[in-house]
Amino acid sequence: MTNATTLTDLTIAEARDAMAKGAFTPLELTNAHLARMEAGRGLNAFITETPDLARMQAERSGERLRAGKAGPMEGIPIGIKDLFCTEGVRTTAGSKILDGFVPPYESTVSANLAKAGAVMLGKTNLDEFAMGSSNKTSASGPVINPWTRTDDDEQLVPGGSSGGSAAAVAGRLAMAATGTDTGGSIRQPAAFCGLVGLKPTYGRCSRWGVVAFASSLDQAGPMTRTVRDAAIMLKAMAGHDPMDGTSAPVEVPNFEAVLSGDIRGLRVGLPRQYRPEGLDPEIAALWDRGAEMLKDAGATLVEVDLPHTKYALATYYIVAPAEASSNLARYDGVRYGLRVPGETLDEMYCKTRAAGFGEEVRRRVLIGTYALSAGYYDAYYLKAQKVRALIAQDFKTAFETVDVLLTPTTPSAAFGLNETIDDPITMYLNDVFTVPTSLAGLPGLSVPVGLSSRGLPLGLQLVGRYFDEETVLNAGLALERASAFTQKPAFLTGALEGQI
């Protein structure tokens, strides 16, 4: 089992068990992925590669394995989304305004993963400041989805904002990667790239050291190729952190240990409002098929109402930009990052922010500033927060009669790199099924279930109660087993090899 291609196809669980038996070393596993990264640079999945650091960490992992002191992710090569501060390794958040910024400290999540033995291959690409659904707003250029349609060779988006993480894992450049999810930024790219993506309950993973977008929504989570791997990685990432005032002081269970796939008696809710007029027939059929899979596995299907769902997108696109406008006020060119000289301090601020922020970030900062302005605060931001509370109450009511919800993850399969680029509203609609879960702070899991008629992966989303990731993951395992999704992107079958 030392063939490089074979090594990069392994799951975290398979690699962990094989290394424990001495089948190969962490360094061999890391070198296989570094070679894959070099071959796959055309995907633009990484902003910064750290091969020397990765090899050093892999060697130390080997020493711990030999000493019988292996961590739960010992020797597993992963990507870290370039929104997580990494001590001594530049962090850009996909923006020009953080040019040259090298953090003097480590984010809690990446530190937890390092303590668990994970090996960092590099920092993955993302939409600028995690604002986007396509990974086209990155100052480092767009990420290419490893998947292609069966009827054309147009390059596709991987989704966003965690598109680099998604492309890296789908393309076997990394075994797993961290993502962040504000309104769907883990789940949507996971669906577009045929991966498992988990947004944990808000407060499950620390936000300390994660560059902020919308502080009441941002949540770190794992992006993997299997549900079991997501469970393993979440255990390593999670935990109360006194450095983060929103980190929940709750016990972190062994998510992998409770995975059985037995969902007999599980009550699965199907929200009526998630089947709007004009829903893509393929998405509707996939949802129906997924529901039948869970029913065949012993679950009971129950229709539920989430009446305020129709207001979720409008609410999100007031709350998130408002928080972003406040968070991004700190980028002024004074203490770190890009600085464009000006004759006055105000001119320096203006020139720096104009040159440093991309179009989408500027758009959201302006929207947020407007929503928070004295004359409009009550009409927009305050009203949005009230509607957000109603959306959360809808979920609470639904969970009185069901254990999990099953919905589509996205309204379509991955779209072309040059599609919808000039239409921000159409782009925002990509989050229509994921945003309500984020507003409520609930855990949401996207699982690949099938392919579209054009050969692209499609995912379904499972939503659970607060801090009940165990039930969500177990239902996800049942769905994963029933769907038996094993297809690989064209990048792995040779169709793109000549382009990379």
From Swiss-Prot:
Active-site annotation: 81 (charge relay system), 161 (charge relay system), 185 (acyl-ester intermediate)
Ligase found in the keyword field: yes
Keywords (A to Z) from UniProt: ATP-binding, Ligase, Nucleotide-binding, Protein biosynthesis
InterPro entries, sorted: Amidase (IPR000120), Amidase_CS (IPR020556), Amidase_dom (IPR023631), AS_sf (IPR036928), GatA (IPR004412)
Subunit and interaction comment: Heterotrimer of A, B and C subunits.
Example GO molecular function: glutaminyl-tRNA synthase (glutamine-hydrolyzing) activity
Reactions this protein catalyses: L-glutamyl-tRNA(Gln) + L-glutamine + ATP + H2O = L-glutaminyl-tRNA(Gln) + L-glutamate + ADP + phosphate + H(+)
Protein name: Glutamyl-tRNA(Gln) amidotransferase subunit A
Keyword Cell wall biogenesis/degradation among record annotations: no
UniProt record similarity statement: Belongs to the amidase family. GatA subfamily.
Annotated gene: gatA
Reported function: Allows the formation of correctly charged Gln-tRNA(Gln) through the transamidation of misacylated Glu-tRNA(Gln) in organisms which lack glutaminyl-tRNA synthetase. The reaction takes place in the presence of glutamine and ATP through an activated gamma-phospho-Glu-tRNA(Gln).
Gene Ontology process terms (BP): translation
Pfam families recorded: Amidase (PF01425)
Enzyme Commission number(s) of this protein: 6.3.5.7
SUPFAM superfamilies to which the protein is assigned, alphabetical: Amidase signature (AS) enzymes (SSF75304)
Catalytic class of the enzyme: ligase
Annotated organism of origin: Rhodospirillum rubrum (strain ATCC 11170 / ATH 1.1.1 / DSM 467 / LMG 4362 / NCIMB 8255 / S1)
GO cellular component, one term: glutamyl-tRNA(Gln) amidotransferase complex
Organism ancestry: Bacteria, Pseudomonadati, Pseudomonadota, Alphaproteobacteria, Rhodospirillales
